[in-house]
From Swiss-Prot:
Enzyme class per UniProt: lyase
Gene: trpG
Enzyme nomenclature, EC number: 4.1.3.27
The protein, known as: Anthranilate synthase component 2
PROSITE patterns per the UniProt record, alphabetical: GATASE_TYPE_1
Catalytic reaction(s) noted: chorismate + L-glutamine = anthranilate + pyruvate + L-glutamate + H(+)
Organism for this UniProt entry: Haemophilus influenzae (strain ATCC 51907 / DSM 11121 / KW20 / Rd)
A GO molecular function held by the record: anthranilate synthase activity
InterPro entries: Anth_synth/Amidotransfase (IPR050472), Class_I_gatase-like (IPR029062), GATASE (IPR017926), TrpG/PapA_dom (IPR006221)
Role, per record: Part of a heterotetrameric complex that catalyzes the two-step biosynthesis of anthranilate, an intermediate in the biosynthesis of L-tryptophan. In the first step, the glutamine-binding beta subunit (TrpG) of anthranilate synthase (AS) provides the glutamine amidotransferase activity which generates ammonia as a substrate that, along with chorismate, is used in the second step, catalyzed by the large alpha subunit of AS (TrpE) to produce anthranilate. In the absence of TrpG, TrpE can synthesize anthranilate directly from chorismate and high concentrations of ammonia.
Amino acid sequence: MANILFLDNFDSFTYNLVDQFRVLGHNVTIYRNDCDLEKLVETALNTPDTILALSPGPGTPSEAGILLPLIERLKNQVPIIGVCLGHQALIQAFGGKVVHAGEVLHGKVSRISHDNEAMFKDLANPMPVARYHSLMGQDLPKEFIVNAEYNGIIMAIRHRDLPICAFQFHPESILTVQGSQLLQQSIEWLLNR
């Protein structure tokens, strides 16, 4: 069981993701992205089996309160999982770019291809997932491996050395086949890295 410190980037999907983590048996504490950075860092460093979860949200990573500074402070110290905006923020925090995806996607199901490694082990391939985004990561930093993609768009990443993973799509959506299993395998991968 993980103690998930969940950074809410003021998104309507937050509680779906929180509920999914709780159904999987994990403790979840929610912090808004305008909370006190120092207190959250201290909590993260002093809580056993901590995983920092970065939620979806509107806008860009730079507009999301303490999101980027929090990643900078904790990226070498606690496991991190990001979804949608959280995924984009991790790419940006390590030196990549966030750009317009060329289309606005809201509840679009796409069949992503993945590497069947780490978080995706033994999952359907291609895997139907729900996409809700207009931005995407680009120029992926060398520290990351692309786990999954769709038509050249990065759909999932994992860090080569650190316990960090992220998804552009929404694993918590009912439209994502095996999303619950993907989240559980991600938590296990993060804790055992």
